[in-house]
């Protein structure tokens, strides 16, 4: 680096006023305005840095350092912050910078950031400027040491997500400042990220800042970084090498534990394509052979005298056995409508098979389903079905005549009662007419005997002997069981008593 450039930068640092930081009784959440760095160049720009939490730090370049880039990045939702330390053998000069916390009352989003080149002029990267950052040309930054605490450096960066970068930034390259992940107490000093400029580059009013890609190196090839420890309670930051060792040990322990669990437990079969089960289909019957299993008491096991079903046995024997099992499960099995699938598994070291499942699928036509559901329309209505159609046919008509059944029952009962009354009346009328006829004949006979017969032509016929009644007297003078006797048994005296009344 030319000495003139170093001297000019040193003069700028000596002439720049120290930053003002608010200490004392203020809390860690108060916003601190950043100091302004003024330069003796053509244009002087003072901006406010509104990124990060309230942190005040003092950097002193009193020790020479090697040309090894020192990289520190903070965990932020945006890009990491890189702070390169260029080579410098000059001493003296203090640079004080302060980073203020993002104002909570701001409503504008940081869409773009305005950066200042090495000469002090500010160039906009485009868009609305929500945040601004001022860079001062410094050439005497050495190894970072905190004046108040020379042994420990306070930082809240998380090295788990810290990428090690090889900075190749030019004087016009912007540096992204990301918000810190924890707030520091007021009074403690934390190193701030300040870019350095190499060489004196003339700047113009409308200089365009160009981004240069940074090359990311793997975590294993990290450069010599200074161990950083945090004094914040509950947060400890380890160096990159220690983090790598801890991660490696953690991964190793996890792998050993996983291997130990697998070795002590049941052997796990490596995942791979499963072997498809052979399926034989003949007509409406299917035979599905699954992998061999051990005999189980809950399974139906069939010992076979011939070759097993899952082996290359004749299809006729398989079909016969499958058909027999399917018809046994469903007596009304119809090959035209039903499909039977038999799932079996051969038994290890035995000529037997285990019947695992018998599935019968019934293929019904829509017409058959409609006829079955038609009879249960009331149940469908209760289940939430409002309509059912098959072509032009709809749900069955509902009979809303609630009095039809009681009316029919009443009519039948009344008809039965009328028939019963008519039968009783017929029987009574027949008996009455018979009594009247007998009484009339008796009166006529008595009139004829007394001679007062009106009809002279009336002839009284002799009754046959079988119709005459006469008491039979036994030898002992007692009446017998029957008093009807034939006419021949009458005595002559009885016959003389009869007179011929015929004129």
Curated annotation (Swiss-Prot):
Glycans are attached at residues 25, 89, 94, 145, 154, 167, 206, 303. Involved in the regulation of both adhesion and cell morphology and cancer progression. Functions as an anti-adhesive molecule that maintains an open filtration pathway between neighboring foot processes in the podocyte by charge repulsion. Acts as a pro-adhesive molecule, enhancing the adherence of cells to immobilized ligands, increasing the rate of migration and cell-cell contacts in an integrin-dependent manner. Induces the formation of apical actin-dependent microvilli. Residues 1-21 form the signal peptide. The modification Phosphothreonine is found at residues 463, 501. GO terms for biological process: cell adhesion; cell migration; epithelial tube formation; leukocyte migration; negative regulation of cell adhesion; negative regulation of cell-cell adhesion; podocyte development; positive regulation of cell migration. Both the O-glycan-rich domain of the extracellular domain and the C-terminus PDZ-binding motif (DTHL) in the cytoplasmic tail harbor an apical sorting signal. The cytoplasmic domain is necessary for the apical membrane targeting and renal tubulogenesis. The large highly anionic extracellular domain allows to maintain open filtration pathways between neighboring podocyte foot processes. The cytoplasmic C-terminus PDZ-binding motif (DTHL) is essential for interaction with NHERF1 and for targeting NHERF1 to the apical cell membrane. The extracellular domain is necessary for microvillus formation. Coiled coil: none annotated. Residues 20-50, 131-183, 222-236 have a biased composition (Polar residues). Disruption phenotype: Die within the first 24 hours of postnatal life from profound defects in kidney and/or gut formation. They are anuric (no measurable urine in the bladder), and fail to generate the extensive interdigitated foot process and instead retain cell junctions between immature podocytes. Keywords: Cell adhesion, Cell membrane, Cell projection, Glycoprotein, Membrane, Phosphoprotein, Signal, Transmembrane, Transmembrane helix. It is found in: Apical cell membrane; Cell projection, Microvillus; Membrane raft; Cell projection, Lamellipodium. Expressed in liver cells and hematopoietic cells (at protein level). Glomerular epithelium cell (podocyte). Residues 426-503 are cytoplasmic. Pfam families: CD34_antigen (PF06365). InterPro entries: CD34/Podocalyxin, PODXL. Belongs to the podocalyxin family. This is Podocalyxin. The chain crosses the membrane at residues 405-425. The modification Phosphoserine is found at residue 482. N- and O-linked glycosylated. Sialoglycoprotein. The keyword Repeat does not apply. Monomer; when associated with the membrane raft. Oligomer; when integrated in the apical membrane. Found in a complex with EZR, PODXL and NHERF2. Associates with the actin cytoskeleton through complex formation with EZR and NHERF2. Interacts (via the C-terminal PDZ-binding motif DTHL) with NHERF1 (via the PDZ domains); interaction is not detected in glomerular epithelium cells, take place early in the secretory pathway and is necessary for its apical membrane sorting. It is a single-pass type I membrane protein.
